[in-house]
Amino acid sequence: MSSWRKAKKSEQKHRLKRIARTRVQAFARDVRISAHKARRVIDQIRGRSYVETLTLLELMPYRASYPIFKLLYSAAASASHNLGFKEADSYISKAEVNEGAVLKRLKPRARGRSYLIKKPTCHITIVLKDRTLNEMSTPTSLS
């Protein structure tokens, strides 16, 4: 491998480390709720502050709000413990729901038949960022 290529790889590693220090990701895999129902909640909290989102999730009547609440709480705990983020300055920069595996079960019916029951799962991803770090990293124009 040429020295130019090694230098480029090293530069990419350092760039990824810088990005990793400014955000915290939390994943919930195989949550037993349909992706469509979880997206209904996720779409309402994307881009909001951490404190505002906790209030919203506590008041929402949807079943999907509890696993999302737990995941958000976990992400904030990781951010404050590992990177020293203040919870008041954190906001949700990215929140997405993807479909997971479908659990298939059989429901017995009359005359020896059976119907298929599909139990959908989903994967939830939440990324928290700190507003103060983003303000410091953006360059200001000199005019």
Swiss-Prot record:
InterPro entries, sorted: Ribosomal_uL22, Ribosomal_uL22_bac/chlpt-type, Ribosomal_uL22_bac/org-type, Ribosomal_uL22_CS, Ribosomal_uL22_sf
Pfam families: Ribosomal_L22
Keyword terms, alphabetized: Chloroplast, Plastid, Ribonucleoprotein, Ribosomal protein, RNA-binding, rRNA-binding
GO biological process: translation
Signal peptide start and end residues: none
Coarse class of the protein's main subcellular location: plastid
Top-level lineage group: Eukaryota
Localization terms from the record: Plastid, Chloroplast
Gene Ontology molecular-function annotations: rRNA binding; structural constituent of ribosome
GO CC list: chloroplast; large ribosomal subunit
Record-stated family: Belongs to the universal ribosomal protein uL22 family.
Function, in words: This protein binds specifically to 23S rRNA. The globular domain of the protein is located near the polypeptide exit tunnel on the outside of the subunit, while an extended beta-hairpin is found that lines the wall of the exit tunnel in the center of the 70S ribosome.
Subunit structure: Part of the 50S ribosomal subunit.
Protein's name according to its UniProt entry: Large ribosomal subunit protein uL22c
Upper classification of the organism: Eukaryota, Viridiplantae, Streptophyta, Embryophyta, Tracheophyta
